[in-house]
Swiss-Prot record:
Keywords: Chloroplast, Membrane, Photosynthesis, Plastid, Thylakoid, Transmembrane, Transmembrane helix. Belongs to the Ycf4 family. Seems to be required for the assembly of the photosystem I complex. It comes from Chlamydomonas reinhardtii. This is Photosystem I assembly protein Ycf4. It is a multi-pass membrane protein. One of its GO terms (cellular component) is photosystem I. HAMAP family: Ycf4.
Amino acid sequence: MTQNNILIRRYIIVGERRFSNYWWAIVIFLGSCGFLATGICSYLGIPNWLSLLNIGTTFSSETETLASGIVPFFPQGLLMSFYGSLGFLLSIYWSLLIFWNVGGGFNEFNKKEGFVRIFRWGYPGKNRKIDLSYSLKDIEAIRVELKQGLDAQRTIYLRLKGKREIPLTGIGQPLTLKEIEKQASELANFLQVSLEA
């Protein structure tokens, strides 16, 4: 997403607040609740609530169905509890990342005042706000890096004097080759610097 002006350009970086992260946090939470419920039910020696849903579909007696719905605690119930706890903790962690919006922020290129500002949200603590500011005079080039393979990476870098490179694209934010080329060329034209591959 871009907010354009003649003298100011701002590119919004989404960070952790993507639909896929919401989806996986919810799916992992629901799955872990099922695993935990099964583990707790097996520990207490009561039929699992999921097996009670099958009572009306089987032709055996109700006592056989209830007895077959009890999962032995060792090793199945113990493992189900372990995986459920792990999944629950993972979903809580993922939810906190979404809440904190880790990696979210913006890249601002301001010709009016002559600076580049790169802002990102990090993990809570002393360095929660990552706010970098550079003069436009320090920018040497815009560089595009394309890595092919199973985990293809397409990154736009801002190269400063002294060969320091700062990534401008967000992590986990896949852009098509056409989008990355367009964004990099627009940025190089706006800043009037060279574009390197």
